[in-house]
Protein backbone atom coordinates (compact mmCIF):
# COMPACT_ATOMS: atom_id res chain seq x y z
CA UNK A 1 0.00 0.00 0.00
CA UNK A 2 1.29 3.44 -0.88
CA UNK A 3 1.92 5.88 1.92
CA UNK A 4 -0.51 8.80 2.28
CA UNK A 5 2.14 11.22 1.08
CA UNK A 6 1.88 9.82 -2.44
CA UNK A 7 -1.40 11.76 -2.77
CA UNK A 8 0.44 15.08 -2.90
CA UNK A 9 2.09 15.24 -6.31
CA UNK A 10 -1.21 14.99 -8.18
CA UNK A 11 -4.77 15.05 -6.91
CA UNK A 12 -5.84 12.84 -9.81
CA UNK A 13 -7.35 9.53 -8.81
CA UNK A 14 -8.90 10.78 -5.58
CA UNK A 15 -12.17 8.90 -5.15
CA UNK A 16 -13.48 10.00 -1.73
CA UNK A 17 -14.43 13.55 -0.73
CA UNK A 18 -14.73 13.91 3.04
CA UNK A 19 -16.83 16.89 4.13
CA UNK A 20 -16.28 18.13 7.70
CA UNK A 21 -13.17 15.97 7.63
CA UNK A 22 -11.80 16.69 11.12
CA UNK A 23 -8.41 15.12 11.83
CA UNK A 24 -9.12 12.33 9.38
CA UNK A 25 -11.14 9.41 10.75
CA UNK A 26 -12.81 8.61 7.43
CA UNK A 27 -9.66 9.46 5.48
CA UNK A 28 -7.63 7.05 7.61
CA UNK A 29 -10.28 4.41 6.92
CA UNK A 30 -10.16 5.13 3.18
CA UNK A 31 -6.35 4.93 3.17
CA UNK A 32 -6.23 1.47 4.69
CA UNK A 33 -8.90 0.29 2.24
CA UNK A 34 -6.74 1.53 -0.63
CA UNK A 35 -8.79 4.59 -1.66
CA UNK A 36 -7.40 8.09 -2.09
CA UNK A 37 -9.33 10.84 -0.33
CA UNK A 38 -9.38 14.58 0.13
CA UNK A 39 -10.98 16.36 3.07
CA UNK A 40 -12.48 19.80 3.58
CA UNK A 41 -11.99 21.07 7.12
CA UNK A 42 -12.69 24.44 8.74
CA UNK A 43 -10.56 24.08 11.89
CA UNK A 44 -6.90 24.94 11.41
CA UNK A 45 -5.79 22.70 14.26
CA UNK A 46 -7.41 19.65 12.69
CA UNK A 47 -5.81 20.65 9.40
CA UNK A 48 -2.38 20.63 11.05
CA UNK A 49 -2.99 17.05 12.16
CA UNK A 50 -4.09 16.13 8.65
CA UNK A 51 -1.01 17.71 7.06
CA UNK A 52 1.27 15.90 9.51
CA UNK A 53 -0.48 12.64 8.61
CA UNK A 54 -0.07 13.22 4.88
CA UNK A 55 -3.78 13.63 4.20
CA UNK A 56 -4.83 15.81 1.25
CA UNK A 57 -6.81 18.71 2.69
CA UNK A 58 -8.51 21.95 1.74
CA UNK A 59 -8.73 24.35 4.68
CA UNK A 60 -12.08 25.94 4.01
CA UNK A 61 -15.71 26.31 4.96
CA UNK A 62 -17.74 23.51 3.34
CA UNK A 63 -20.52 25.85 2.20
CA UNK A 64 -18.05 28.39 0.76
CA UNK A 65 -16.30 25.61 -1.18
CA UNK A 66 -19.62 24.48 -2.61
CA UNK A 67 -20.73 27.97 -3.61
CA UNK A 68 -17.47 29.52 -4.83
CA UNK A 69 -14.74 26.90 -5.26
CA UNK A 70 -16.51 23.76 -6.42
CA UNK A 71 -14.29 23.51 -9.50
CA UNK A 72 -11.26 22.86 -7.25
CA UNK A 73 -12.65 19.46 -6.25
CA UNK A 74 -10.99 16.71 -8.34
CA UNK A 75 -13.28 15.38 -11.05
CA UNK A 76 -12.24 11.86 -10.12
CA UNK A 77 -14.27 12.04 -6.89
CA UNK A 78 -16.99 9.37 -6.91
CA UNK A 79 -17.83 9.08 -3.22
CA UNK A 80 -19.29 11.81 -1.01
CA UNK A 81 -18.73 11.18 2.68
CA UNK A 82 -18.97 13.15 5.86
CA UNK A 83 -20.28 13.73 9.33
CA UNK A 84 -21.67 17.24 9.87
CA UNK A 85 -20.81 18.72 13.30
CA UNK A 86 -23.02 16.98 15.83
CA UNK A 87 -23.08 19.38 18.79
CA UNK A 88 -26.46 20.90 17.96
CA UNK A 89 -28.02 17.43 17.67
CA UNK A 90 -26.13 15.57 20.38
CA UNK A 91 -27.50 14.74 23.81
CA UNK A 92 -24.21 16.21 25.03
CA UNK A 93 -24.95 19.51 23.25
CA UNK A 94 -27.57 22.19 23.80
CA UNK A 95 -30.10 20.53 21.53
CA UNK A 96 -31.16 23.40 19.25
CA UNK A 97 -31.03 21.01 16.32
CA UNK A 98 -32.96 18.38 18.26
CA UNK A 99 -35.76 20.84 18.93
CA UNK A 100 -35.85 21.78 15.25
CA UNK A 101 -35.69 18.20 13.91
CA UNK A 102 -39.14 18.21 12.32
CA UNK A 103 -38.50 21.54 10.62
CA UNK A 104 -35.17 20.33 9.25
CA UNK A 105 -36.96 17.37 7.64
CA UNK A 106 -39.05 19.89 5.75
CA UNK A 107 -35.94 21.82 4.72
CA UNK A 108 -34.60 18.65 3.07
CA UNK A 109 -37.78 18.27 1.02
CA UNK A 110 -37.94 21.99 0.21
CA UNK A 111 -34.36 21.94 -1.05
CA UNK A 112 -34.95 18.95 -3.33
CA UNK A 113 -38.19 20.35 -4.69
CA UNK A 114 -36.51 23.55 -5.82
CA UNK A 115 -37.62 26.18 -3.33
CA UNK A 116 -35.50 29.32 -3.02
CA UNK A 117 -32.22 28.53 -1.30
CA UNK A 118 -32.10 32.09 0.04
CA UNK A 119 -35.43 31.57 1.78
CA UNK A 120 -34.32 28.20 3.11
CA UNK A 121 -31.10 29.76 4.44
CA UNK A 122 -33.04 32.54 6.14
CA UNK A 123 -35.38 30.05 7.81
CA UNK A 124 -32.41 27.94 8.91
CA UNK A 125 -30.76 31.03 10.37
CA UNK A 126 -33.88 31.67 12.43
CA UNK A 127 -33.49 28.29 14.15
CA UNK A 128 -30.80 29.89 16.31
CA UNK A 129 -27.90 27.44 15.91
CA UNK A 130 -25.98 27.87 12.62
CA UNK A 131 -24.56 24.35 12.90
CA UNK A 132 -28.03 22.89 12.38
CA UNK A 133 -27.93 24.00 8.73
CA UNK A 134 -24.78 21.99 8.09
CA UNK A 135 -26.70 18.72 8.04
CA UNK A 136 -28.10 19.86 4.65
CA UNK A 137 -24.65 20.35 3.12
CA UNK A 138 -24.16 16.78 1.80
CA UNK A 139 -27.46 17.05 -0.09
CA UNK A 140 -26.46 20.46 -1.41
CA UNK A 141 -23.14 19.02 -2.62
CA UNK A 142 -24.97 16.24 -4.46
CA UNK A 143 -27.31 18.75 -6.11
CA UNK A 144 -24.31 20.90 -7.06
CA UNK A 145 -22.64 17.92 -8.75
CA UNK A 146 -25.85 17.09 -10.64
CA UNK A 147 -26.38 20.68 -11.80
CA UNK A 148 -22.75 21.40 -12.79
CA UNK A 149 -21.69 20.74 -16.38
CA UNK A 150 -19.05 18.04 -16.89
CA UNK A 151 -19.71 16.63 -13.43
CA UNK A 152 -21.39 13.36 -12.57
CA UNK A 153 -23.61 12.47 -9.60
CA UNK A 154 -21.63 10.73 -6.88
CA UNK A 155 -21.73 6.94 -7.20
CA UNK A 156 -21.93 6.47 -3.45
CA UNK A 157 -22.77 8.58 -0.40
CA UNK A 158 -21.75 7.77 3.18
CA UNK A 159 -22.94 9.95 6.07
CA UNK A 160 -22.71 9.54 9.84
CA UNK A 161 -24.00 11.46 12.82
CA UNK A 162 -25.29 11.03 16.36
CA UNK A 163 -28.32 8.68 16.69
CA UNK A 164 -30.79 11.55 17.06
CA UNK A 165 -30.13 12.41 13.40
CA UNK A 166 -31.46 9.03 12.16
CA UNK A 167 -34.88 10.58 11.28
CA UNK A 168 -33.08 13.07 9.03
CA UNK A 169 -31.08 10.31 7.35
CA UNK A 170 -34.38 8.49 6.77
CA UNK A 171 -35.71 11.55 4.94
CA UNK A 172 -32.41 11.74 3.01
CA UNK A 173 -32.92 8.10 2.01
CA UNK A 174 -36.50 8.82 0.96
CA UNK A 175 -35.57 11.66 -1.39
CA UNK A 176 -32.50 9.83 -2.74
CA UNK A 177 -34.64 6.83 -3.66
CA UNK A 178 -37.16 9.08 -5.40
CA UNK A 179 -34.76 10.95 -7.69
CA UNK A 180 -37.31 13.75 -7.75
CA UNK A 181 -36.94 17.49 -8.22
CA UNK A 182 -33.39 18.79 -8.37
CA UNK A 183 -32.04 15.24 -8.30
CA UNK A 184 -33.11 15.26 -11.96
CA UNK A 185 -34.06 11.59 -12.07
CA UNK A 186 -30.86 10.33 -10.47
CA UNK A 187 -32.09 7.67 -8.07
CA UNK A 188 -30.13 5.88 -5.35
CA UNK A 189 -30.48 2.73 -3.35
CA UNK A 190 -30.30 4.02 0.23
CA UNK A 191 -30.42 2.55 3.72
CA UNK A 192 -29.66 3.88 7.19
CA UNK A 193 -29.06 2.30 10.58
CA UNK A 194 -27.82 3.00 14.09
CA UNK A 195 -24.54 1.15 14.64
CA UNK A 196 -22.76 0.42 17.93
CA UNK A 197 -19.04 0.91 17.59
CA UNK A 198 -18.02 -1.83 20.03
CA UNK A 199 -19.70 -4.33 17.69
CA UNK A 200 -17.11 -3.41 15.05
CA UNK A 201 -14.00 -3.76 17.19
CA UNK A 202 -13.84 -0.22 18.59
CA UNK A 203 -12.90 -0.32 22.31
CA UNK A 204 -15.58 2.17 23.34
CA UNK A 205 -19.35 2.34 23.49
CA UNK A 206 -20.50 4.86 20.91
CA UNK A 207 -23.57 4.79 18.70
CA UNK A 208 -23.79 6.45 15.30
CA UNK A 209 -26.56 6.96 12.77
CA UNK A 210 -25.18 5.94 9.37
CA UNK A 211 -26.56 6.40 5.87
CA UNK A 212 -25.22 4.50 2.85
CA UNK A 213 -26.50 5.27 -0.65
CA UNK A 214 -25.39 3.88 -4.02
CA UNK A 215 -26.47 4.32 -7.61
CA UNK A 216 -28.63 1.45 -8.90
CA UNK A 217 -26.83 -1.50 -10.42
CA UNK A 218 -24.08 -1.60 -7.81
CA UNK A 219 -25.82 -4.21 -5.68
CA UNK A 220 -28.30 -4.22 -2.82
CA UNK A 221 -27.32 -2.34 0.33
CA UNK A 222 -27.33 -4.43 3.49
CA UNK A 223 -26.50 -3.52 7.06
CA UNK A 224 -22.77 -3.90 7.87
CA UNK A 225 -22.21 -7.21 9.62
CA UNK A 226 -21.16 -6.86 13.25
CA UNK A 227 -17.90 -8.58 14.15
CA UNK A 228 -18.09 -8.38 17.95
CA UNK A 229 -20.70 -8.78 20.66
CA UNK A 230 -22.44 -5.69 22.08
CA UNK A 231 -21.43 -4.43 25.49
CA UNK A 232 -23.89 -4.80 28.35
CA UNK A 233 -22.28 -4.60 31.77
CA UNK A 234 -25.44 -6.03 33.35
CA UNK A 235 -25.01 -9.34 31.52
CA UNK A 236 -21.95 -10.32 33.52
CA UNK A 237 -18.99 -12.10 31.87
CA UNK A 238 -18.81 -10.86 28.29
CA UNK A 239 -17.52 -14.24 27.13
CA UNK A 240 -20.69 -15.93 28.32
CA UNK A 241 -23.00 -13.75 26.23
CA UNK A 242 -25.29 -15.73 23.94
CA UNK A 243 -23.57 -15.35 20.56
CA UNK A 244 -26.52 -17.01 18.83
CA UNK A 245 -28.56 -13.84 19.37
CA UNK A 246 -26.04 -11.62 17.59
CA UNK A 247 -24.50 -14.06 15.10
CA UNK A 248 -20.93 -13.40 16.25
CA UNK A 249 -18.71 -14.96 18.88
CA UNK A 250 -15.93 -12.45 19.45
CA UNK A 251 -16.37 -10.39 22.62
CA UNK A 252 -16.05 -6.64 22.53
CA UNK A 253 -12.56 -5.18 23.00
CA UNK A 254 -11.65 -3.70 26.37
CA UNK A 255 -9.61 -0.59 27.11
CA UNK A 256 -6.86 -2.74 28.59
CA UNK A 257 -6.63 -4.93 25.50
CA UNK A 258 -6.50 -1.98 23.12
CA UNK A 259 -3.88 -0.07 25.10
CA UNK A 260 -1.74 -3.16 25.76
CA UNK A 261 -1.74 -4.04 22.05
CA UNK A 262 -0.80 -0.49 21.04
CA UNK A 263 1.93 -0.36 23.67
CA UNK A 264 3.62 -3.43 22.20
CA UNK A 265 4.07 -1.92 18.73
CA UNK A 266 7.46 -0.57 17.66
CA UNK A 267 8.05 3.06 18.60
CA UNK A 268 4.64 3.41 20.21
CA UNK A 269 3.97 6.57 22.27
CA UNK A 270 1.47 4.49 24.26
CA UNK A 271 3.02 3.15 27.48
CA UNK A 272 0.60 0.72 29.08
CA UNK A 273 2.99 0.05 31.96
CA UNK A 274 2.05 3.38 33.55
CA UNK A 275 -1.49 2.08 34.03
CA UNK A 276 -0.50 -1.24 35.61
CA UNK A 277 -0.49 -2.14 39.29
CA UNK A 278 1.85 -4.99 40.21
CA UNK A 279 2.01 -5.98 36.58
CA UNK A 280 -1.74 -6.12 35.94
CA UNK A 281 -4.29 -3.73 34.50
CA UNK A 282 -6.64 -2.71 37.29
CA UNK A 283 -7.34 0.88 36.32
CA UNK A 284 -10.81 2.35 36.10
CA UNK A 285 -12.23 5.52 34.60
CA UNK A 286 -14.67 8.01 36.10
CA UNK A 287 -16.54 9.82 33.34
CA UNK A 288 -16.66 13.59 32.99
CA UNK A 289 -20.39 13.22 32.36
CA UNK A 290 -23.13 12.28 34.81
CA UNK A 291 -25.32 9.24 34.27
CA UNK A 292 -29.04 8.69 34.76
CA UNK A 293 -29.68 12.41 34.40
CA UNK A 294 -27.70 13.22 37.56
CA UNK A 295 -24.60 15.35 36.83
CA UNK A 296 -23.12 14.28 40.17
CA UNK A 297 -23.48 10.59 39.37
CA UNK A 298 -20.35 10.06 37.30
CA UNK A 299 -20.25 6.76 35.44
CA UNK A 300 -17.44 4.26 35.98
CA UNK A 301 -15.77 1.82 33.58
CA UNK A 302 -13.17 -0.76 34.52
CA UNK A 303 -10.13 -1.50 32.36
CA UNK A 304 -11.71 -4.83 31.43
CA UNK A 305 -14.58 -2.95 29.74
CA UNK A 306 -14.81 -0.68 26.69
CA UNK A 307 -14.33 3.04 27.22
CA UNK A 308 -17.18 5.49 27.46
CA UNK A 309 -17.86 7.44 24.27
CA UNK A 310 -14.64 9.36 23.55
CA UNK A 311 -15.73 13.00 23.33
CA UNK A 312 -13.85 16.27 23.05
CA UNK A 313 -13.79 16.29 26.87
CA UNK A 314 -11.94 12.96 27.08
CA UNK A 315 -9.02 14.65 28.86
CA UNK A 316 -11.37 15.47 31.76
CA UNK A 317 -12.13 11.82 32.48
CA UNK A 318 -10.34 10.70 35.63
CA UNK A 319 -8.21 7.56 35.40
CA UNK A 320 -7.28 5.73 38.60
CA UNK A 321 -4.70 2.95 38.47
CA UNK A 322 -6.20 1.25 41.50
CA UNK A 323 -8.46 1.70 44.51
CA UNK A 324 -5.65 3.27 46.56
CA UNK A 325 -5.22 6.06 43.98
CA UNK A 326 -8.96 6.64 44.09
CA UNK A 327 -9.08 6.86 47.88
CA UNK A 328 -6.11 9.25 47.83
CA UNK A 329 -7.85 11.30 45.11
CA UNK A 330 -4.83 10.98 42.81
CA UNK A 331 -6.31 10.65 39.33
CA UNK A 332 -4.43 10.46 36.07
CA UNK A 333 -5.68 11.29 32.57
CA UNK A 334 -5.52 9.49 29.26
CA UNK A 335 -2.82 10.87 26.98
CA UNK A 336 -3.73 12.00 23.48
CA UNK A 337 -2.20 8.87 21.85
CA UNK A 338 -4.11 6.69 24.33
CA UNK A 339 -7.35 8.52 23.59
CA UNK A 340 -6.66 8.11 19.88
CA UNK A 341 -6.17 4.36 20.30
CA UNK A 342 -9.53 4.13 22.07
CA UNK A 343 -10.92 5.74 18.90
CA UNK A 344 -8.95 3.14 16.83
CA UNK A 345 -6.55 5.66 15.32
CA UNK A 346 -3.09 4.19 14.69
CA UNK A 347 -0.93 4.27 17.82
CA UNK A 348 1.56 6.66 16.18
CA UNK A 349 -0.92 8.96 14.46
CA UNK A 350 0.71 12.43 14.45
CA UNK A 351 -1.75 14.55 16.44
CA UNK A 352 -0.80 18.21 15.93
CA UNK A 353 -2.00 21.74 16.61
CA UNK A 354 -4.03 22.80 19.64
CA UNK A 355 -7.21 21.32 21.14
CA UNK A 356 -6.06 17.80 20.41
CA UNK A 357 -8.55 16.22 22.81
CA UNK A 358 -11.33 17.97 20.91
CA UNK A 359 -9.91 16.70 17.64
CA UNK A 360 -9.85 13.13 18.94
CA UNK A 361 -13.40 13.32 20.25
CA UNK A 362 -14.80 14.87 17.08
CA UNK A 363 -13.41 12.17 14.82
CA UNK A 364 -15.09 9.16 13.28
CA UNK A 365 -13.47 6.00 14.71
CA UNK A 366 -11.40 4.77 11.74
CA UNK A 367 -12.25 1.12 12.37
CA UNK A 368 -15.96 1.87 12.16
CA UNK A 369 -15.21 3.98 9.08
CA UNK A 370 -13.46 1.02 7.44
CA UNK A 371 -16.49 -1.19 7.96
CA UNK A 372 -18.94 1.41 6.66
CA UNK A 373 -16.85 2.49 3.65
CA UNK A 374 -16.03 -1.09 2.70
CA UNK A 375 -19.71 -1.95 2.94
CA UNK A 376 -20.64 1.02 0.76
CA UNK A 377 -17.94 0.60 -1.89
CA UNK A 378 -17.45 -3.17 -1.96
CA UNK A 379 -20.52 -4.67 -0.31
CA UNK A 380 -18.34 -6.57 2.15
CA UNK A 381 -16.34 -6.15 5.35
CA UNK A 382 -12.70 -5.04 5.31
CA UNK A 383 -10.19 -7.87 5.25
CA UNK A 384 -8.33 -9.08 8.30
CA UNK A 385 -5.10 -7.87 6.70
CA UNK A 386 -6.49 -4.36 6.18
CA UNK A 387 -7.71 -4.15 9.77
CA UNK A 388 -4.37 -5.40 11.08
CA UNK A 389 -2.44 -2.87 8.99
CA UNK A 390 -4.54 -0.04 10.45
CA UNK A 391 -2.72 -0.27 13.79
CA UNK A 392 0.27 1.72 12.49
CA UNK A 393 0.43 4.90 10.41
CA UNK A 394 3.15 5.16 7.74
CA UNK A 395 5.85 7.80 8.06
CA UNK A 396 5.26 11.05 6.18
CA UNK A 397 8.32 13.00 4.93
CA UNK A 398 8.54 16.61 6.19
CA UNK A 399 8.58 17.86 2.59
CA UNK A 400 5.22 16.18 2.01
CA UNK A 401 3.78 17.87 5.09
CA UNK A 402 4.89 21.28 3.81
CA UNK A 403 3.53 20.60 0.34
CA UNK A 404 0.16 19.59 1.78
CA UNK A 405 0.10 22.70 3.94
CA UNK A 406 0.81 24.82 0.86
CA UNK A 407 -2.08 23.16 -0.99
CA UNK A 408 -4.49 23.44 1.92
CA UNK A 409 -3.48 26.84 3.32
CA UNK A 410 -1.17 28.34 0.71
CA UNK A 411 -3.45 31.30 0.10
CA UNK A 412 -4.53 32.15 3.63
CA UNK A 413 -6.83 34.88 2.37
CA UNK A 414 -9.19 32.09 1.32
CA UNK A 415 -8.99 30.20 4.61
CA UNK A 416 -11.69 30.72 7.26
CA UNK A 417 -10.32 33.76 9.17
CA UNK A 418 -11.52 32.72 12.64
CA UNK A 419 -9.71 29.41 12.34
CA UNK A 420 -6.24 30.99 12.26
CA UNK A 421 -6.19 31.63 16.00
CA UNK A 422 -3.71 28.85 16.66
CA UNK A 423 -0.27 28.52 18.14
CA UNK A 424 2.76 28.53 15.82
CA UNK A 425 3.28 25.23 14.05
CA UNK A 426 5.86 23.04 15.72
CA UNK A 427 8.14 21.23 13.32
CA UNK A 428 8.22 17.52 14.00
CA UNK A 429 10.32 14.73 12.65
CA UNK A 430 8.63 12.04 10.59
CA UNK A 431 6.91 9.49 12.84
State what each model feature region is.
Residues 2, 264-431:
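C-terminal target-recognition/interaction regions appended to catalytic cores
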Residues 12-15:
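Extreme N-terminal starter segment of soluble prokaryotic enzymes
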Residues 17-66, 81:
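SAM cofactor-binding core of SAM-dependent methyltransferases
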Residues 67-77, 91-302:
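Class I S-adenosyl-L-methionine
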Residues 77-83:
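Short SAM/SAH-binding signature in class I
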Residues 87:
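Active-site beta-alpha loop architecture of Rossmann-like, nucleotide-cofactor-dependent enzymes
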Amino acid sequence: MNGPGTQVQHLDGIRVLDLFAGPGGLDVAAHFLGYKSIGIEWDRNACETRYAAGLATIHADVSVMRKNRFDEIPRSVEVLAGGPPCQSFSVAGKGAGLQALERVKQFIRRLVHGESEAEIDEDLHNLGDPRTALVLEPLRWLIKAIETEEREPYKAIVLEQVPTVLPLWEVYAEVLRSGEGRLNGHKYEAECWVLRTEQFGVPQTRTRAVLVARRPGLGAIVRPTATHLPFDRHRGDRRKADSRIFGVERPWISMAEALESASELDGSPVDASRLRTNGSMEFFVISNYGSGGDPKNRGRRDSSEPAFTVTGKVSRNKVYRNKADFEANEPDRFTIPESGVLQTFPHNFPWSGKDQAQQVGNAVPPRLGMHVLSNALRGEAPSTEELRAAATWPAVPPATVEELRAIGCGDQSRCPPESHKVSPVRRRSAP
